[in-house]
């Protein structure tokens, strides 16, 4: 089974920059998207062979997630079921026969860490939500988690200490999530691989220099870790400031 996740930084814009071509070529069973920045009714494109599920933010042109699945899920839910967290279209959960898939676009703490306090509350609620699901079936979590977990996960870690995405608080919450029963699929297979990033600033020729961050993940319930066949970073795929990430399960 092949699964793909991509923060497209605006799906309509990405459609003009190779999204459909990549989607067709990779032929994923499930394709998850973050930061759609659109409402479903604005879509002037179709993805034949895929069921579509959208969760858009109340605020137009902001945030949003979507799941495209070849197999129709047993059930699909939107959000965490907590009003204060469910206005920005950040979570879609699809239940399948053997597992849950959770597609997430984690809130960015923002420049000046304006949303760090909210982010901490979000992290606790999201972790609790995943653990409830995990009691029922194994869980696959994908998306832009907006945190580089370890120093190896970003190029310039020294100068980014305490910047959004690499604060001690955000990293500690990621550690809490993993410790609670989840495996970072990429580090499971490639624990010491350097230069593996999924997001690059549009400034300072960051992508050209590979001065990036690994903030997009596939996490797997620990009891399914031995089913991880590969965890992929498609760094050569442009179209967004993020690149797609993939998970192949046995």
Task: List each model region and its residues.
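N-terminal, active-site-proximal structural segment of metallo-dependent hydrolase catalytic domains
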Residues: 1-47, 51, 57-62, 78, ...
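Active-site-proximal beta-strand elements of phosphoester/diester hydrolases
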Residues: 1-9, 98-110, 142
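Active-site beta-strand/loop signature of hydrolases that rely on acidic residues for catalysis
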Residues: 7, 23-41, 101, 130-151, ...
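Metal-dependent phosphoesterases centered on the DNase I-like endonuclease/exonuclease/phosphatase
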Residues: 30, 51, 125-211, 215
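Structured beta-strand-rich core segments of catalytic domains in phosphoester-bond hydrolases
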Residues: 37, 43-109
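Conserved beta strand-loop-helix elements of the APE1-like EEP
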Residues: 60-75, 194, 203-226
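Active-site beta-strand termini and strand-to-loop segments that position acidic
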Residues: 70, 94-97, 221-222, 247-250
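Surface-exposed cleft-lining segments at the edges of enzyme active sites
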Residues: 81-82, 107-123, 158-163
